[in-house]
């Protein structure tokens, strides 16, 4: 969208300022080269600007141009739990030895309450309060829950209570299990107490939240 707007302004001779483009192709792998490149002295002058406009965002719809004023950050990590030094038979050891998959499932299950609220003490301490006026502006966007559900293939939307879908997408932090593994998952069945379990977990963070603190 921004590129087409630039193209139009050049074509109509209405461009009011200089414009610099930075194309970065490593976002999906964590942008390992970008930070190092940006801090080089010879690039600081090249990148100097009054305003930065990020194009890696969505539009409300393909017919409604959108400018995002913020993006949620990310805190991600892997949690690994260990139990016995090898898998055990649940008929012989069930009820006497802690099962890492059971414990991991319980731990993950305590992070969110029934209203979609993250229960970790202090998690929301630094979350900026969005004013009623700002929330009203967010919800003026032409958006439909029904269309959204259809686009992602679900019948019911889920999320933090007392916030709209647009608010939950943009101004509220979230917790998600990105992957979980443990025990036997092959063909057939093995009645075991697994020796370990792990999960890949992520938090989407909002303005003022520090991923190191989280």
What annotation goes with each model-predicted range?
Residues 25-26, 55-58, 81-84, 180-182:
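Fold-independent oxyanion-binding glycine-rich loops
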Residues 85-91, 186-187:
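Short small-residue beta-strand/loop micro-motif enriched in glycine and branched aliphatics
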Residues 1-30, 77-81, 94-114, 201:
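Alpha-helical metal-binding/catalytic segments enriched in His/Glu/Asp
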Residues 54, 78-80, 119, 176-179, ...:
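Structured core elements
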Residues 1-70:
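Acidic/histidine-rich catalytic neighborhood of metal-dependent amide-processing enzymes
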């Amino acid at each position: 969208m921004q590129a087409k707007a630039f193209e139009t302004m050049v074509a109509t001779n209405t461009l009011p300022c200089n414009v610099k483009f930075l194309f970065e192709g490593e976002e999906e792998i964590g942008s390992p080269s970008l930070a190092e490149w940006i801090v080089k002295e010879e690039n600081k002058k090249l990148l100097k600007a009054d305003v930065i406009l990020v194009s890696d965002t969505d539009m409300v719809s393909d017919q409604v141009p959108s400018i995002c004023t913020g993006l949620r950050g990310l805190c991600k990590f892997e949690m690994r739990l260990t139990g016995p030094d090898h898998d055990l038979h649940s008929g012989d050891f069930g009820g006497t030895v802690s099962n890492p998959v059971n414990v991991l499932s319980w731990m993950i299950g305590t992070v969110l309450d029934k209203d979609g609220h993250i229960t970790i003490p202090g998690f929301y301490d630094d979350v900026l309060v969005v004013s009623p006026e700002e929330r009203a502006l967010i919800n003026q966007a032409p958006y439909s829950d029904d269309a959204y559900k259809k686009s992602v293939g679900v019948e019911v939307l889920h999320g933090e209570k007392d916030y709209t879908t647009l608010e939950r997408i943009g101004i509220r932090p979230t917790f998600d299990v990105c992957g979980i593994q443990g025990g036997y998952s092959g063909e057939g069945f093995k009645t075991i107490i697994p020796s370990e379990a792990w999960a890949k977990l992520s938090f989407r963070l909002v303005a003022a939240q520090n991923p190191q603190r989280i």
